[in-house]
């Protein structure tokens, strides 16, 4: 490695090129080189290691063995985003316009009204308070790189100039010769030069749950699958190994994933896009009304300055002050509800994103499966038996008295190094922690359940010699004394890979008797092996032999290094196959996803056969759907002759995936409904997510390993596992499944869809009162009547009576089975659309305005000012110097008296809006169903009705409100003037819904169904 290793892209302006380079497959070639070639490349020695001088030189050249921290976003920037992003912009604009209007009034009037100033202050307070609330709800620093740092080993054992030295992991250099043992964390990417029973846990990197053997031999072209490379930050679980460091820091496979994850840019969440669209609509409506009435005011002879104040007033009146807080609280309530169902949401906007999801890319191990190997089948006496792993052995379906089974159930626990961890007697067997690898743990639990105490069995059959499993032999062997006091022979037991069974066995046990292993039995054996292997199960063979006492007498010294005992002509006893079984709730959850129109794609680092078997087991590949390989096998033709379009399902290997063009990838995603990606790298997982997004899908990704973190970050919503998930995956994700169960995602989808529907209802309810709030201002300008509703009372509606009721709609249950409809189309199905605006502003809002004005005109008429007399009276009404304004009865009114009547009208108009909002709240419970069909089961909504009524009564009758908020007591009869309009709203909307149900897809639905 004479020149600086350039396999890792340098930081430069072409950031996109850097990211594209990172998405490519790992550019490691050292696994294909001989040890001598690797030594030459890195200027090192396989025995002596680097010289101290070379190590110092390489440290200067390459820098420390550490991950480069990404630029982090300061907390104040995050706070500002909450304060000035999305919906807040609309309120800030309103506040600035209010201050501007007040400034104009202050500059042109002797005694300017303070309404605009108060409104500006309140709007500012609303934005700041809601911004703080959102910030603290979502407060999370970008700790992705910090969690990667936690995975970095602190110390490493290196050999320099022939001496073993313990150094800080950051000082490990490319070319260093290092030594690792069981329990160590690998300090860099290393090319293994020697190994003794070494196994590493690559699950965080590749997703494989089984520990992988390491040896000096190249076993695969793919560096992630070969046995002679050990990766930075993975764990050595047993054995020892030596190797030459080939990559450090950012150049390691883990470093590439870290840089890829932290460098990914994520787009806006669907709800953020919807809120932006809503702002555009509201701004458009506000500006249109404002400009229209600005022109009208100029035509009517108002001064330019007055017209500007009117323009600002109308724009501000269109701002729904309470809606930002309502949306935030609704999302928070749903997030809390989801947390109770094991879905912890880190980002409030992610609550709705899950409901919009159209594609779920799910990891296999631990998400769809239980993340624990379990014995699934056994083959003995020439029959396949299903294993019984129930605690009470109620599922047993084979003869446990069979002599062959008794022999198999003796070999399996004796030729096994796994053991239960201490102090777990009260824990059920299936849930006990085991010291040992996954396959041996499965065998241990199976035998403990079926036959009783394994420890007792081992005590009775004392082990005297053992050859541990190694990749070369592919078997494990142990020799035991037998429990029969009258038999002094030693029992040799062996288990291992299938390819090593037949050549070591001369006999097979059938019905408890040894018989020759003839061709017929070999064929039966192969058929059983192929059948179990085809189910994606890991198959192990078991055999035994009672060693002749004359050759191996009591006390014989067995030598396991230079084998001095018989290891062939054994008796084959049976097969046992293991699989990481699907979670019980997953098939039902996948079925619900399918009925909800959500495509579930499996993306795993595991073997294609295993992945396909699990996919079929959980319903990702449904019964009857075939892959091209299945079609080829059925028709007995080569795979190349099968048209890929004929196969609804497909299983794609990572090695094939890397050769696909973007168009080919899009073609697969578009034309196959059921897809499994196997043996995928972290970069490929990311490419799959980007491919789905390119086709317009809203993608959810589930994962638990470091290998999943780039895809989790890029997805529209990343879902990490709370129990088995790495810190890195949890930091990259938007949501965490506390129970690691895929079925919880379906619950989340349901909640997400429900909150979208309920937000629509909340917004429709809130926007409706905008019209009775705006129209008094318009009549004030055009007809020149006294103002019917003041700024203060508008604030009491938006931030007082309306808010609790709007939030109560978040508790509304679904109208129909929302998991039976297709996912929301982000282009067509908007949170706020023209139909919602038409209903809220053009229909229900107009009826509400009529109710408010009816109360207004009745009160003024009772006080002597008939409607005909009010037209054009505004200038005299608001003239402070005029204290003898005459009404229709001939009474003279001072300015103060007139204002008391006006403020009483404001209060009556306010109460009228509350009364008509009762009906609006009830009709907003549903968008299509009749309220009678839905019922009044939402107790929070009923409370909301009482709350807004009680608040209105409090504001009307509480002493001191006339001074504080200019609200005056009303006669009890004045509360009833708006009742007919409230009833009219209810009847009108029920009639609309009846037509919707009777004539689906008709004109009424096209124009009014929001």
Curated annotation (Swiss-Prot):
Region (Interaction with phosphoinositide-3 kinase): 69-71
Signal sequence extent: none
Bilayer topology term: Multi-pass membrane protein
Any Pfam family hit: Cation_ATPase
Database matches in CDD domains: P-type_ATPase_Na-K_like
Naturally occurring in which organism (per UniProt): Oreochromis mossambicus
Biased composition (Polar residues): 201-216
SUPFAM superfamilies: Calcium ATPase, transduction domain A, Calcium ATPase, transmembrane domain M, HAD-like, Metal cation-transporting ATPase, ATP-binding domain N
NCBIfam families registered for this protein in UniProt: ATPase-IIC_X-K, ATPase_P-type
GO BP: any one term: sodium ion export across plasma membrane
Name of the protein: Sodium/potassium-transporting ATPase subunit alpha-3
The protein's role, per its UniProt record: This is the catalytic component of the active enzyme, which catalyzes the hydrolysis of ATP coupled with the exchange of sodium and potassium ions across the plasma membrane. This action creates the electrochemical gradient of sodium and potassium ions, providing the energy for active transport of various nutrients.
Residue(s) carrying Phosphoserine: 930
Localization (cell): Cell membrane
Membrane-crossing residue ranges in chain numbering: 75-95, 119-139, 276-295, 308-325, 760-779, 790-810, 831-853, 906-925, 939-957, 973-993
Cytoplasmic-side positions: 1-74, 140-275, 326-759, 811-830, 926-938, 994-1010
Entry annotation: catalytic residues: 363 (4-aspartylphosphate intermediate)
GO cellular component term of the entry, any: endoplasmic reticulum
Quaternary structure and interacting proteins, as annotated: The sodium/potassium-transporting ATPase is composed of a catalytic alpha subunit, an auxiliary non-catalytic beta subunit and an additional regulatory subunit.
Keyword Secreted recorded: no
Gene Ontology MF: a single term: ATP hydrolysis activity
Location of the region described as Disordered in the Swiss-Prot/TrEMBL record: 1-21, 201-221
């Amino acid at each position: 490695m004479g020149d600086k290793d350039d396999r890792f892209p340098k930081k430069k302006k072409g950031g996109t090129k850097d990211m594209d380079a990172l998405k490519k497959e790992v550019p490691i070639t050292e696994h294909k080189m001989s040890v001598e070639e690797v030594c030459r490349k890195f200027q090192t020695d396989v025995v002596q290691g680097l010289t101290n001088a070379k190590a110092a030189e390489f440290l200067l050249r390459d820098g420390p063995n550490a991950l480069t921290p990404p630029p982090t976003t300061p907390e104040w920037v995050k706070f500002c985003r909450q304060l000035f992003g999305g919906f807040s912009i609309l309120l800030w604009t309103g506040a600035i316009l209010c201050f501007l209007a007040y400034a104009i009034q202050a500059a042109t009037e002797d005694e300017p009204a303070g309404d605009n100033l108060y409104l500006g202050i309140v709007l500012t307070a609303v934005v700041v308070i809601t911004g703080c609330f959102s910030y603290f709800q979502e407060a999370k620093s970008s700790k992705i790189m910090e969690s990667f740092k936690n995975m970095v080993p602190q110390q490493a054992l290196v050999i320099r100039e022939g001496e073993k030295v313990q150094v800080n992991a950051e000082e490990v250099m490319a070319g260093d010769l290092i030594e690792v043992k069981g329990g160590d964390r690998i300090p860099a990417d290393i090319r293994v030069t020697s190994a003794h029973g070494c196994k590493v846990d690559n699950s965080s990197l590749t997703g494989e749950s089984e520990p992988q053997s390491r040896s000096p031999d190249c076993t695969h072209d793919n560096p992630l699958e070969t046995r002679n490379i050990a990766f930075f930050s993975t764990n050595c679980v047993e054995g020892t190994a030596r190797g030459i460091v080939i990559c450090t820091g950012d150049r390691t496979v883990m470093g590439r994933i870290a840089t890829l994850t932290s460098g990914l840019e994520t787009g806006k969440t669907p709800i953020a896009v919807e809120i932006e669209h809503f702002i555009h609509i509201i701004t458009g409506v506000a500006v249109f009304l404002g400009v229209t009435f600005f022109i009208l005011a100029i035509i009517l002879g108002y001064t330019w300055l007055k017209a500007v104040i009117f323009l600002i007033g109308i724009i501000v009146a269109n701002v729904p002050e309470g809606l930002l807080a309502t949306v935030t609280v609704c999302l928070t309530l749903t997030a809390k509800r989801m947390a109770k169902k094991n879905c912890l949401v880190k980002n409030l906007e992610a609550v709705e994103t899950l409901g919009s999801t159209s594609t779920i890319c799910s990891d296999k191990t631990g998400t769809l499966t239980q993340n624990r190997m379990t014995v699934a089948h056994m083959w003995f006496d020439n029959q396949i038996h299903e294993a019984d792993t129930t605690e009470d052995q109620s599922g047993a379906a084979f003869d446990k008295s069979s002599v062959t089974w008794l022999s198999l159930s003796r070999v399996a626990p004796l030729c096994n190094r796994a053991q239960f961890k201490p102090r777990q007697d009260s824990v059920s067997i299936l849930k006990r922690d085991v010291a040992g690898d996954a396959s041996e743990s499965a065998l241990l639990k199976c035998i403990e359940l079926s036959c009783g105490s394994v420890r007792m069995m081992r005590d009775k059959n004392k082990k005297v010699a053992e050859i541990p499993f190694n990749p070369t032999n592919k078997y494990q062997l142990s020799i035991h004394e037998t429990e029969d006091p009258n038999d002094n022979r030693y029992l040799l037991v062996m288990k291992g890979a299938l390819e090593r069974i037949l050549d070591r066995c001369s006999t097979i046990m059938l019905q408890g008797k040894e018989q020759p292993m003839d061709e017929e039995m070999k064929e039966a054996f192969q058929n059983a092996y192929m059948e179990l292997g085809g189910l994606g199960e890991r198959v192990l063979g078991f055999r035994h032999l009672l060693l002749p006492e004359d050759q191996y007498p009591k006390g014989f010294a067995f030598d396991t290094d230079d084998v001095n005992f018989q290891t062939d002509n054994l008796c084959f006893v049976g097969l046992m196959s293991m699989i990481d079984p699907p979670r019980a709730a997953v098939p039902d959850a996948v079925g619900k996803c399918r009925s909800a129109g959500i495509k579930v794609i499996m993306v795993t680092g595991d073997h294609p056969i295993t992945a396909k078997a699990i996919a079929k087991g959980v319903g990702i590949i449904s019964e009857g759907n075939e892959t091209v390989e299945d079609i080829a096998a059925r028709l007995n033709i080569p795979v190349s002759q099968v048209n890929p379009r004929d196969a609804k399902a497909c299983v794609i290997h990572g090695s094939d995936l890397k050769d696909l063009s973007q168009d080919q990838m899009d073609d697969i995603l578009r034309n196959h409904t059921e897809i499994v990606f196997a043996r995928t790298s972290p970069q490929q997982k990311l490419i799959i997510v980007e491919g789905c997004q390119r086709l317009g899908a809203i993608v959810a990704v589930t994962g638990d390993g470091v290998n999943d973190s780039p895809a989790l970050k890029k997805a529209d919503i990343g879902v990490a596992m709370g129990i088995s998930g790495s810190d890195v995956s949890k930091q990259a994700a938007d949501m965490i499944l506390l129970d690691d169960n895929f079925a919880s995602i379906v619950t989340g989808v349901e909640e997400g869809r429900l909150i979208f529907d309920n937000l629509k209802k909340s917004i429709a309810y809130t926007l409706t009162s905008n019209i009775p709030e705006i129209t008094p201002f318009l009549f004030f300008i055009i007809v020149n009547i006294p103002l019917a509703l003041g700024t203060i009372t508008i604030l009491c509606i938006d931030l007082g009576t309306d808010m609790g009721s709007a939030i109560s709609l978040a508790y509304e249950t679904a109208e129909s089975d929302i998991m039976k409809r297709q996912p929301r189309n982000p282009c067509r199905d908007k949170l706020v659309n023209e139909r919602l605006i038409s209903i809220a502003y053009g229909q229900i809002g107009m009826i509400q305005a009529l109710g408010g004005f009816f109360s207004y005109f009745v009160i003024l008429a009772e006080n002597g000012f008939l409607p005909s007399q009010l037209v054009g009276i505004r200038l005299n009404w608001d003239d402070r110097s005029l204290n003898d304004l005459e009404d229709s009865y001939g009474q003279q009114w001072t300015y103060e008296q007139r204002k008391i009547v006006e403020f009483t009208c404001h209060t009556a108009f306010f109460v009228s809006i509350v009364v008509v909002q009762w009906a609006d709240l009830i009709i907003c419970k549903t968008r299509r169903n009749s309220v009678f069909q839905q019922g009044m089961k939402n107790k929070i909504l009923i409370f909301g009705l009482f709350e807004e009524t009680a608040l209105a009564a409090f504001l009307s009758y509480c002493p001191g409100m006339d001074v504080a908020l200019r609200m005056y007591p009303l006669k009890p009869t004045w509360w009833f003037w708006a009742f007919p309009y409230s009833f009219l709203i209810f009847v009108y909307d029920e009639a609309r819904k009846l037509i919707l149900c009777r004539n689906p897809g008709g004109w009424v639905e096209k124009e009014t169904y929001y």
